[in-house]
């Protein structure tokens, strides 16, 4: 600045300026100068230039000469009051450098180090803001006028400076370049030696800028003072120093009050500890964490009172309370997109700091962030924070966590890392984008984890720019290692809108330029009614909604969709269509992202849809089973798959009643979200496939949706991501074979399987991996037409089953499945069948095996009889399965473990434990006991092996050729078909077993069906209360003994399978007895692992019995058994 003033005065040397330079400066700034500067602009520049040059003088190079940046009022302890712009000489610093002793003309004392700066630094200028992000600059200028500006240093590129200038409601950013000779310039024609000269020049002449630099943006927030006094090196405070005022809120462990620290007349926040809520040590851990962290966006600890109860934690006071309530109650025209992005950037900066300090927060959410003046946001509530000594932190048993904000690996394994905080940050970002909406609207807590497993993710909020939503989705990657770090997130915010402004992006998303206030309006009451109306329409025209909804939704809010948005908007509508069952169509608003509609309304719609959906889901399944004529049933199922894939309960949930519920409840809200997501994010070819399965109108709508599906995320946020072809076959096979209870279970697995092929990350998928493999084979590996065939076949099977009564249907359905099985070569057929069976039956191995030789004989007789449509479809499926065994095997090998990849450590430990096993004798006894408890797997396996040799085989083979090709095409490829056969009966599970190699036992027609039903029913009928912890533990011991015996004798592979089947059956029944949600999640994951391991053993029995290979397979099995045992014993 001094140089500028000298230039104005006409001096060529600093020394030429006398001690009365201030007079010269003011005169020079007020005096007209012969130049092309405008007098008005010069006078405006003088208003802020003259003050900043008050300290300029001969002593400018003195390193101890500083200038005050902010006002500071002394509060005792030898502190010194200073005013902005005042000169002072620094005499020394305290032990931590946070306070410095200074001398002014008013005296000597301590002042905060971050309140002063060297007199020759840029920070002394009101227009220089130091390291400030692009987003923060836009925020700081958001309330300015034309000509408001600031100069900032790039946070991402230190040393690189820019000018941010506001004009006509928009902020323009100009990079300050450095020439080879060291001179600075914005416009190459005008170069300057110093930054101050450059700023002064552009304050008088635009010279390439949109307008002149008139008004420096104020530095709004004073920096945090760490510690209330320079001598304050102990944290314990006197309780009498705090005056408690009114209550601000409460939490799990205590309450928060506003108080006054009398000694310093400072308003503070006082967090108290409830009596008997946790130990003092735990309470003090939070204070210990806060002592170690110092960041402008982290709430600062001031002291503690722990000498006697009640205990206090005293922190700085934030004027506007928690971020969640602030967002819900704020004026949305004031708290616009720029402010929201600024808030998110501040939080990411705080979390980046914690990441570098190796801290994890473990409770990051809008409710735990606080808001101060000028939209300052600080992360607070470190009650669950921990200093990391390794890559992960394991929470103690019984710890409580917010499910909707907790990463899946944390829910399943109690493992926390900075990556689990990243997941929570994604949810927090969604909260900010929706002005404080509750995450996963309409979805029950118990369903969140299952939906996430199925690759469901929340929809993009209305008006949310694509880049921001992509960042959310990146935070929600299933594998923790795939999520970005907070450093990357912060950098993403800094560079997110380099070529445009967020305001413009939001306007584009809303579909109307200049409608800035529309967002807040849309989010309010009117939306709810709209959603209701939408849902009604969707329900009334569910069959036709798929096609009309897309245009309809667009019409509502997308009247002027952007050219780049068409793909997105259709996707959103599609999602809405998915929800039609439960009123999901209400999501049409979501579809009009481009329109005014808000994410809130769409989510609310989904919620409403949820209530109707559960009933529809369950009713549709029942009707399908009992009413063959209901053609709509098939269509509904197809929709359910797309919408309700999420809804399907995991195989883990043994309770039949439970499985329907999840499918309903989850399916509706999730389905809505999912379908929309599915349509939006799925690829067009997948949509086409699915369309074939569903009614023609559905197909049309889906195809359209596929075309418009969103660009970046192939999978929808929801489970709907499952390939359509796969999903269709899956739901059919599942629904057909089992009653509602079993159906829910099987359905779930198959659906997941379909997902899995496309989305390897999904954990649940392993449970249905086999099934998924089958589905994927039909849909992915073969041409799309294969998928169609499968779909058609499934329809036929469905019809047959529905038409025939439980008694009559078995003969027709059974004979053909049996024939197919027989047709498969004994040796090769078994593996293929097993693969097919895997998907259909978890533990169905027993069901398949249960088919006795007698039943085989029975089947042989009926096998010769005329084939019903169901039989033919089954035969075709069987044929397809035999043809694609290689493919199936490959897929099986690729299957990922169901649980999230979270803590690798847990898996390693489990793997190591498998080596330990009880004595062989004990194992033998345990095996026997297990056999008595459930259908004997050994017999089933043996019978399966023997079956191929039986004459029934020959019959079966002829049957395959006899079936017309067109029909076989319909069933194309899903080995699942056997499962569908028993759909009307509980024996559905047995049908699944039939898919396995043991399926050769299917020779008996009616008798087989009966035996299968019996085999499957016992596990299904077991009341959850009947299976106790002891039963499960005994079963795990039995399996360990069987494995130990097998490893030594290299025999009795079937005994291991049988023991595993028994354990699986008991676990599925026991899962509902687990009360703690987190343990239930982990137990389901363990069941999925067990199921996958058993399938692998069934598919490749040879490897299990061959030396090292067998050991490896059993190691995985033992690992899952150990995990189950650990969870049960918690």
From Swiss-Prot:
Q: Which residues carry this modification: Phosphothreonine?
A: 735, 751, 781, 814, 823, 844, 852
Gene Ontology CC: actin cytoskeleton; cytoplasm; cytosol; dendrite; glutamatergic synapse; growth cone; mitochondrion; neuronal cell body
The sequence motif named Nuclear localization signal 3 is recorded at: 762-769
| Biological source species | Homo sapiens (Human)
- One GO MF term: syntaxin binding
Name the source's superkingdom: Eukaryota
Q: Where is the composition biased (Polar residues)?
A: 689-698, 740-752, 965-975
Recorded catalytic activity of this chain's protein = L-tyrosyl-[protein] + ATP = O-phospho-L-tyrosyl-[protein] + ADP + H(+)
By what name is this protein known? Tyrosine-protein kinase ABL1
Residues covered by region (DNA-binding): 869-968
């Amino acid at each position: 600045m001094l140089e500028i003033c000298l230039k104005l005065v006409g001096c060529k040397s600093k020394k030429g300026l006398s001690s009365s330079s201030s007079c010269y400066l003011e005169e020079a700034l007020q005096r007209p100068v012969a130049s092309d500067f405008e007098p008005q602009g010069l006078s405006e520049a003088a208003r802020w230039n003259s003050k900043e040059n008050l300290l300029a003088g001969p002593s400018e190079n003195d390193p101890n000469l500083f200038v005050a940046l902010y006002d500071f009022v002394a509060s005792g302890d030898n502190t010194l009051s200073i005013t902005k712009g005042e000169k002072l000489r620094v005499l020394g610093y305290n032990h931590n450098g946070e306070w410095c002793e200074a001398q002014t003309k008013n005296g000597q004392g301590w002042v905060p180090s971050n309140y002063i700066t060297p007199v020759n630094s840029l920070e002394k200028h009101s227009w220089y803001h130091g390291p400030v992000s692009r987003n923060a600059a836009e925020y700081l200028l958001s309330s300015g006028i034309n000509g408001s500006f600031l100069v900032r240093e790039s946070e991402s590129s230190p040393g690189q400076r820019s000018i941010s200038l506001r004009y006509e409601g928009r902020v323009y950013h100009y990079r300050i370049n450095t020439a080879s000779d060291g001179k600075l310039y914005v416009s190459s024609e005008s170069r300057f030696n110093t930054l101050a000269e450059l700023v002064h020049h552009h304050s008088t002449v635009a010279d390439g800028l949109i307008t002149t630099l008139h008004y420096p943006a104020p530095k709004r927030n004073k920096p945090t003072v760490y510690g209330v006094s320079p001598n304050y090196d102990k944290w314990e405070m006197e309780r009498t120093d705090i005056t408690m005022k009114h209550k601000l809120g409460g939490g799990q462990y205590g309450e928060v009050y506003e108080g006054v620290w009398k000694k310093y007349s400072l308003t503070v926040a006082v967090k108290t500890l409830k009596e008997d809520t946790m130990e003092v040590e735990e309470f003090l851990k939070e204070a210990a964490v806060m002592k170690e962290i110092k960041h402008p966006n982290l709430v600062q600890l001031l002291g503690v009172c722990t000498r006697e109860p009640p205990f206090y934690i005293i922190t700085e006071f934030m004027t506007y309370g928690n971020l969640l309530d602030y967002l819900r109650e704020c004026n949305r025209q004031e708290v616009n997109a720029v402010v929201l992005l600024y808030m998110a950037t501040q939080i990411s900066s705080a979390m980046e700091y914690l990441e570098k300090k190796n801290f994890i927060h473990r409770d990051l959410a809008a409710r735990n962030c606080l808001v101060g003046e000028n939209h300052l946001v600080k992360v607070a509530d470190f009650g669950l924070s921990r200093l990391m000594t390794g890559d992960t932190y394991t929470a103690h048993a019984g710890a409580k966590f917010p499910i909707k904000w907790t990463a899946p690996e944390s829910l399943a394994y109690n493992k926390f890392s900075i990556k689990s905080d990243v997941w929570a940050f994604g949810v927090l970002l969604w909260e900010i984008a929706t002005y404080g909406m509750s995450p996963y609207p309409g979805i029950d807590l118990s369903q969140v984890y299952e939906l996430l497993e199925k690759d469901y993710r929340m929809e993009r909020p209305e008006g949310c720019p694509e880049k921001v939503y992509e960042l959310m989705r990146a935070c929600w990657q299933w594998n923790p290692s795939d999520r970005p770090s907070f450093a990357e997130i912060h950098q993403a915010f800094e560079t997110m809108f380099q070529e445009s402004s967020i305001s413009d992006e939001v306007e584009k998303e809303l579909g109307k330029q200049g409608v800035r206030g529309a967002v807040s309006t849309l989010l309010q009451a009117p939306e709810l009614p709209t959603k209701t109306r939408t849902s009604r329409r969707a329900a009334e025209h569910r069959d036709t909604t798929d096609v009309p909804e897309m245009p309809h939704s667009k019409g509502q809010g997308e009247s002027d969709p952007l050219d780049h948005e068409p793909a997105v908007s259709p996707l959103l509508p599609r999602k809405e269509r998915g929800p039609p069952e439960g009123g999901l169509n209400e999501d049409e608003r979501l579809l009009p992202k481009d329109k005014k509609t808000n994410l809130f309304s769409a989510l609310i719609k989904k919620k409403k849809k949820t209530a109707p959906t559960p009933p529809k889901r369950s009713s549709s399944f029942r009707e399908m089973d009992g009413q063959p004529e209901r053609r709509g049933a098939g269509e509904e199922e197809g929709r359910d798959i797309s919408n309700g894939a999420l809804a399907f309960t995991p195989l883990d949930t043994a309770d039949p009643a439970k499985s329907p519920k999840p499918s309903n409840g989850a399916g509706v809200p999730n389905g809505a979200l999912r379908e929309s997501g599915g349509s939006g994010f799925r690829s067009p070819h997948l949509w086409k496939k699915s369309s074939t399965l569903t009614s023609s109108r559905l197909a049309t709508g889906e195809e359209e949706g596929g075309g418009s599906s969103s660009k970046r995320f192939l999978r929808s946020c929801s489970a709907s991501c499952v390939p359509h072809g796969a999903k269709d076959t899956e739901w059919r096979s599942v629904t057909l074979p089992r009653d509602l209870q079993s159906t829910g279970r099987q359905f779930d697995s198959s659906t997941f399987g379909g997902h899995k092929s496309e989305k390897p990350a999904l954990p649940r998928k392993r449970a249905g991996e086999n099934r998924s493999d089958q589905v994927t084979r039909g849909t992915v590996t073969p041409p799309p037409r294969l998928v169609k065939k499968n779909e058609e076949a499934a329809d036929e099977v469905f019809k047959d089953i529905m038409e025939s009564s439980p008694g009559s249907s078995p003969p027709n359905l059974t004979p053909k499945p049996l024939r197919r099985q027989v047709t498969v070569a004994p040796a090769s057929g078994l593996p293929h069948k097993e693969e097919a069976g895997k998907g259909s039956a978890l533990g169905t191995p027993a069901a398949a095996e249960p088919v006795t030789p007698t039943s085989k004989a029975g089947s042989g007789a009926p096998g010769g009889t005329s084939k019903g449509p169901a039989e033919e479809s089954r035969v075709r499926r069987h044929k397809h399965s035999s043809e694609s065994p290689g493919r199936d095997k490959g897929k099986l090998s690729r299957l990922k473990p169901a649980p999230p990849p979270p803590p690798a450590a847990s898996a390693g430990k489990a793997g190591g434990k498998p080596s330990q096993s009880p004595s062989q004798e004990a194992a033998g006894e345990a095996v026997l006991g297990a056999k008595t408890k459930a259908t004997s797997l050994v017999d089933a396996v043996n019978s399966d092996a023997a079956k191929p040799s039986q004459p029934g085989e020959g019959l079966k083979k002829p049957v395959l050729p006899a079936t017309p090709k067109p029909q076989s095409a319909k069933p194309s490829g899903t080995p699942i078909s056997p499962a569908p056969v028993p759909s009307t009966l509980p024996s559905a599970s047995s049908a699944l077993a039939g898919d396995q190699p043991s399926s050769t036992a299917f020779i008996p027609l009616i008798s087989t069906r009966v035996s299968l039903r019996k085999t499957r029913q016992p596990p299904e009928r077991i009341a959850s209360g009947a299976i106790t912890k002891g039963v499960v533990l005994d079963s795990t011991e039995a399996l360990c003994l069987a494995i130990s015996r097998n490893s030594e004798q290299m025999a009795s592979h079937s005994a291991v399978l049988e023991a595993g089947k028994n354990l699986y059956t008991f676990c599925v029944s026991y899962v509902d007895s687990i009360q703690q949600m987190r343990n239930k999640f982990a137990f389901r994951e363990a069941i999925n692992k067990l199921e996958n391991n058993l399938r692998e053993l069934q598919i490749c029995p040879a490897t299990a019995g061959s030396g090292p290979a067998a050991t490896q397979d059993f190691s995985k099995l033992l690992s899952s058994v150990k995990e189950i045992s650990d969870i049960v014993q918690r």
